[in-house]
From Swiss-Prot:
Compartments, as annotated in UniProt: Cell inner membrane
Organism this protein belongs to: Rhodopirellula baltica (strain DSM 10527 / NCIMB 13988 / SH1)
Lineage of the organism: Bacteria, Pseudomonadati, Planctomycetota, Planctomycetia, Pirellulales
Subunit description: F-type ATPases have 2 components, CF(1) - the catalytic core - and CF(0) - the membrane proton channel. CF(1) has five subunits: alpha(3), beta(3), gamma(1), delta(1), epsilon(1). CF(0) has three main subunits: a(1), b(2) and c(9-12). The alpha and beta chains form an alternating ring which encloses part of the gamma chain. CF(1) is attached to CF(0) by a central stalk formed by the gamma and epsilon chains, while a peripheral stalk is formed by the delta and b chains.
Protein origin, superkingdom: Bacteria
Name this polypeptide is given: ATP synthase subunit beta
Binding-site positions, ATP: 158-165
GO terms under cellular component: plasma membrane; proton-transporting ATP synthase complex
Name of encoding gene: atpD
Amino acid sequence: MSTATATGRVTQVIGSTFDAEFPEGQLPKIYNALTIQSEHKGVTIDLTGEVQQHLGGGRVRAIALGSTEGMMRGMNVVDTGKPVSVPVGKATLGRVFNVLGQPIDKRGDVQADDYWPIHRQAPPVNELSTNTELFETGIKVVDLLTPFVRGGKAGLFGGAGLGKTVILTELIARIASSHGGYSVFAGVGERTREGTDLWLEMQETEIGSTGRNVIEQTCMVFGQMNEPPGSRLRVALSALTMAEYFRDTTGADTLLFVDNIFRFSQAGSEVSALLGRMPSAVGYQPTLATEMGALQERITSTKQGAITSVQAVYVPADDPTDPAPATAFGQLDAFIYLERSISEKGIYPAIDPLASNSRILDPQYVGDRHYTIARRVQTILQRYRELQDIIAILGVDELSEEDKTIVHRARRIERFLSQPFLVAEVFIGKPGEITSLEDTIRSFEGICDGKYDHLPEQAFMYVGAIEQAEEQAKKMESK
């Protein structure tokens, strides 16, 4: 930990930004952390800021990483001489932090041996790993149509209330509970209640049959929606730095969950406006692509280890062409698009099987059988979607026999893509189902071949493998 290099004074406070003046020749570098510790009329101020601009004449403009309430001109500002640094290593496991790496779980200080700055370069190209391997999740629609890449990045795109956080929580419960490595969760600008629920859930979920809880292999970093934009902008970098340590020093496979990457862009927009930059399209910051690229390029797999990332992406007004989700979209290996019309049918997860995709849904990576079945499923659903207008006007009876069969099977496929989740057991009254990739492929192959045309549509709702649909059909007949 280096010592302070210079002391200046606050000259201006505007919202979540402040200006400070330093002696000649002692100007802090861009991204250096500044600290203000003061007490005035019984109000104690302990604030950290980050230098964003040099204004000339020894003045800098900084973004506050905490509340500026009570700040006054003339207060002393100390340049720490380095960027914000967070604790890294095994001492962080099981703990909950804020953007500065300070524990917020009321369990005492963190005895970390090392601290890393949150601003780091992405690994050089010659250090990157080029292996491509499917990462099985046990969720049918994901494994069949949008397979995740081990060491890759997957995005959950969706509007408000479509279940992004539920799917993300489910993936944590499934992957982290069967995963031997470390997990890092970044709560970026989302609800504090959801973060608390997740923390409590992780304390109860076991890692396989090891007898240990998921939280023991996880560290969590929060910058929630009630916090200043500077905190929400930098919290993803703090979490990523902790994940990078596990990747680079232990060589372990690391999982990085981010909820929500849109809030990162949103916070950047607020900071940009406070710094006086000219807004770009739809009011976003002109540096949107640069900031997103700098973050996403660090989330990668190297020869030392892998970071597999799952990121929730809020889609404003259900418009996927909005610059924030569109910028994130280009950085991902797999993208899952949540559709409101599917949610309205009561089918969850409300994943659109036609709009979602993955770069490894290719025979070269998943094999011919998997690829063929996935494309057959999508072809049937696509034809069903094309027939919707005709059905709405004329009814199913006016279709050809071939189209009637397609509609018949598409409705069963649509319902079979639903699945009971582990984290939703208390809401739907059914135990969560983890379906193996082989069972998923075999089940959909049977539906496409017409082996289960005799089963009622409702039997396919919220089951795992096809055998459960057959059991459900028998129960329905006996009633």
